Structures are given as structure tokens and as C-alpha cells.
Amino acid sequence: MNKRYLQKATQGKLLIIIFIVTLWGKAVSSANHHKAHHVRTGTCEVVALHRCCNKNKIEERSQTVKCSCFPGQVAGTTRAAPSCVDASIVEQKWWCHMQPCLEGEECKVLPDRKGWSCSSGNKVKTTRVTH
């Protein structure tokens, strides 16, 4: 009977240890998940980059961005970097008003108004907006 009591007590302790370790693991995982995806209000961060070349040897790049903008702002681009911009710029597709190009580059809205191009000399970078 004493041996059986020890086995039951050991099993109980083992279950409690497993339970505590499981809870601790979930708490740590949750804390890391929250830290990794928190973006300070008014800022944006790139969470994924994609880069490839098409058959015409034109380099294509895309990125996934997470932004936390203030009310009245949405995700946009300023000086070739993700940023929060006034929502009316995006709603009305006045892309060049958010100053998306680097200093010295000329901004032009694409004819279909679905993006913009930045040019300097014979180099042209085209950005198409997708949702």
C-alpha cells in the first residue's frame, strides 16, 4: 500500500510539473509573439521582402509592411520607405503628394493611377499599389 501511495504521489507531481511547463511555454510564446508583431503608433516596419527577376531581366521587388498609423493616416511611402501618410492622399491617388521618391528623383503618377514612378536620369523605378 505504501508503494502504491508513492506511485500515485509521483504521478500527481509529474502531472503538475507538465502542466506548469506547458503554461510557462505558452506564456513565453505569447510574449514573444506580441513583441515580434508590435509596431509603435505612427510607424511602419517591413515584415517580409520578396525579390526576383522576370524573363526580361527586370528586377521585381515587393514587400509586406505592418503599420500602426494615427487616426486619419494609412500606410504609404515617404522617401522610398514605408510610412504613415494622410489618408486623403491614398483615397484620391495623389501618390506624389506623399513624397515617395528619394531626393533628386522626379515623381510621376502612372497613367492608370495605380501607382507612381521615380526617375533620375535614365533610371526609372515603378511602384504599383496592390491591396
From Swiss-Prot:
GO CC term, one of those recorded: nucleus
Family classification: Belongs to the TAFA family.
Location relative to the cell: Cytoplasm; Nucleus
Keywords, in A-Z order: Cytoplasm, Nucleus, Signal
Main subcellular localisation: cytoplasm
Tissue spec. comment: Mainly expressed in different brain regions, including cortex, amygdala and hippocampus (at protein level). Expressed by neurons and astrocytes.
Gene Ontology terms describing biological process: memory; visual learning
Domain of life: Eukaryota
Keyword Nucleus set for record: yes
PANTHER family associated with the record: CHEMOKINE-LIKE PROTEIN TAFA FAMILY MEMBER (PTHR31770), CHEMOKINE-LIKE PROTEIN TAFA-2 (PTHR31770:SF1)
Organism: Mus musculus
Disruption phenotype: Mutant mice grow and develop normally but exhibit impairments in spatial learning and memory and impairments in short- and long-term memory, accompanied with increased level of anxiety-like behaviors in open-field test. They also show decreased level of depression-like behaviors in forced-swim test and tail-suspension test. They show neuronal loss, defects in dendritic and synaptic morphology, and apoptosis in the brain.
Lineage of source species: Eukaryota, Metazoa, Chordata, Craniata, Vertebrata
Residues annotated as transmembrane: none
Protein's name according to its UniProt entry: Chemokine-like protein TAFA-2
Signal sequence extent: 1-30
Its biological purpose: Has a role as neurotrophic factor involved in neuronal survival and neurobiological functions.
Gene encoding the protein: Tafa2
